[in-house]
Amino acid sequence: MNRWPVLLLLVFSLDSYVKEETFLSGDLASVSVLSENVNGVIIKVKDDNKKIIPIPYLYEDKNIFIEAINTNIKAKYVNYGESRITIKNESLVNLSPNDSLRVQKEAKLIETVLASSDFSIMPSFEFIRPVKGQITSRYGKQRYINGQKRSVHLALDLDGEVGDKIIAPMKGKVVLVKDLFYTGNTVILDHGGNLFSSYAHMNEAVVSEGDFIIPGSIIGLSLIHI
């Protein structure tokens, strides 16, 4: 989960009117669309139709094509800083062939899960904080593990005590409950309209795949952070 600034795009296409503007890596853009016949969920804001467009994490400034609105937009790289971690168990840093294969399979599984969203669910974007703990690591930081440059941290870490209740931030459907190599006990929720949220490093998951949950529902118990 990253920070949620809502930016306004106003460029002519058949279904959208977008202003020339530069967006930031990892942000969300709120796009005015002239027609409701646009792929994905359209949110009504007074008399205006809005579509939320996620801007991917970028390693450099570039123009990116947004298929949902058939438009190119400018996106700017942002240096979100770095974090350096020391892990004593080298088997978690330099993976064995079997662990590497497991990681690849799990990545494909997650990709499959995120490829399909339940459009009967309308996201509200009124998120409840899943735990009370403070933010311990923000989105977008370049990770260094034992001095080695690794992937960017595309999540938000929240502090917690062992056994703290983790609640659903908004309504949705449980689409994955699994113990994964990198993130341990993990739950992914589908909030509709291709909006998903993920909860990792859990002590225990208390929901099952296919469950429909409401805001504030307990989905699991925390370890030291999620």
Please report, for each region that a protein language model flagged, where it lies by residue.
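A residue-level detector for short acidic-glycine micro-motifs
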Residues: 137, 176, 201-204, 221
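Sec-dependent N-terminal signal peptides
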Residues: 4-12
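Conserved small/polar residues in nucleotide/adenosyl-binding loops
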Residues: 225-226
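Short histidine-centered loop motifs in beta-beta connectors
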Residues: 192-216
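Surface-exposed, glycine-biased beta-strand/turn segments
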Residues: 74-183
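Short, well-structured beta-strand-loop connectors
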Residues: 165-174, 207-222
